[in-house]
Amino acid sequence: MPFSEEPPRVVRLGLSDQVFTFTDATGTEWHWNASLGYQLIEQAPRPPMEFYPSDSGIDMTHLRQRYPSLNEEYAKTVDLSRPILFLPFHDGTSVLCDGWHRLARAVMEGIPCLPCYELTPEEAEQVLVIKIPPKSQPPKLAPMDTQKGRRKP
């Protein structure tokens, strides 16, 4: 596999930075620094937008499927005034990078709307920590003929 001509990018993570991991349909793992996303929002202030979970078909069944380890008891305690954070994804969709518990609380309590931010594509690139390609299967070897007969791979 040839190396990229592009110089490696240095990513700094603080001990308290929250990193969100997402595995797409191809098996590629994406890791984003959500804490840095909020810092970028502070550096380029913008008003929060509104997100309506029901408009996207989000209910508790959906949340439990997408986030199997969701702590519903903790979700009941989170601050709904803090905007959730989306980032644009390469397939034209948006990915929730931070705010799963806030989203769960809103759905559980029937709160129709949450404040949210969406990073720009440039900001999303800045908060990308690493993209790990899917694990590939080792190539299948063809049987070999040897002096003792056909050898299985």
Which role fits each region the language model picked out?
Residues 1-65:
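Glycine-rich short-loop/terminal segments
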Residues 40-97, 107:
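Short alpha-helix boundary/capping and kink motifs at helix termini
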Residues 121-153:
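Amphipathic, charge-rich alpha-helical segments that serve as recognition/docking helices
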Residues 33-35, 77, 103:
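Enriched - but not universal
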Residues 10, 80-134:
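A short, basic-hydrophobic beta/loop patch
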Residues 4, 9-10, 47-50, 55, ...:
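Intrinsically disordered, low-complexity segments enriched in proline/serine/threonine
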